[in-house]
Design a protein with these regions (language model features):
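Conserved beta-strand positions in the Rossmann-like core of class I SAM-dependent methyltransferases
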Residues: 34, 80, 136
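Short secondary-structure boundary segments
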Residues: 37-38, 107-109, 139
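Short, hinge-like loop/turn segments at secondary-structure boundaries
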Residues: 50-54, 98-100, 122-123
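A short acidic, glycine-rich active-site loop
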Residues: 52-63, 117
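Structural beta-alpha unit
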Residues: 70-104
Length: 139
């Protein structure tokens, strides 16, 4: 069964279904849940070049994750929050390895079938290719 659940979220309303599923799964499995957010690094700029900008984004992200975590603690689920700066798919995989996640629960949005190879660029697709643990995609 799943003992450690990683839940990468982008702090939008689109995460509600994945949060709902991870809350239920965490409660049933008595799992430890890690809520994880990646502040996407601006390509071509090192994190040090925009330190104040990233610091503000990290602070707001931690506050938002903290509010989200309250729903888990209210149900008796052990939850922790992590935030970092980087490329989302790569950082999600690193977090999964670091936390020894048994499963990743993440949202997936609809891809326009008219756009060739559109799905190849999605974060969930990249995580699926790079990660060794199971991934539960929630729509």
């Amino acid at each position: 069964m799943f003992r450690r659940i990683l839940v990468p979220i982008d702090l939008s309303e689109r995460n509600a279904p994945a949060l709902k599923v991870s809350l239920a799964l965490g409660r049933v499995a008595r799992a430890k849940v890690t809520l994880f957010h990646v502040v996407q690094q601006v390509p071509g700029l090192a994190a040090g070049e925009m330190r104040d900008f990233y610091d503000r984004l990290l602070t707001v992200s931690r506050q938002t994750l903290g509010r989200t975590a309250k729903a888990f603690t209210a149900k008796g689920i052990a939850v922790r929050c992590e935030v970092c700066v980087g490329e989302p798919a790569r950082e999600i995989v690193r977090a999964a390895v670091r936390s020894r996640a048994d499963v990743i629960v993440m949202g997936s949005h609809r891809v326009d079938p008219k756009r060739r190879f559109a799905a190849l660029g999605t974060t969930s697709y990249k995580v699926g290719i790079l990660c060794r643990c199971p991934i539960l995609l929630v729509k």
